[in-house]
Amino acid sequence: MKNRIMVIGAHPDDIEFGCGGTIVKHKTNGDFVVYVCMTNTESVDGITGNVLRTKDQNKSEVESAVNKLGCDQLEFLPFKDLHVPFNFESVSKLEKYIKKYNINTIYTHWAGDANQDHISTFKTTMAAARYVPNVYC
């Protein structure tokens, strides 16, 4: 049976840096992979607030990465860069995709990360994935 994998990152490029090689390994094994990005906005500098990449640039870069990595599905959650929440809304939105794709393995951020969006993504993932048998951080 193919594994049903979900990779969850707070921002565009987090997933590629964090587990791009793991995605390729799963795709080589014939697994189904869903890429989930918690943010769907421009990327901004956390100190100055200056826009680093527009929403369209981010979307285009993620779509290119998803195609190159061979992911089967791409999903964006509606949260803003620097404002990824850990609350009922974020958990329920992520849980909807976990159920939709019948996911049995998840990869996400490490709990000890210093980035606040990464921490919120970790917490949201752990709550939404409480019934998923394999969660790796």
Regions found by a protein language model. Give the residues of each.
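Active-site rim/loop-helix segments in enzyme catalytic domains that contact anionic ligands
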Residues: 1-101
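Active-site adenylate/phosphate-handling loop in enzymes that bind or generate adenylated species
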Residues: 94-137
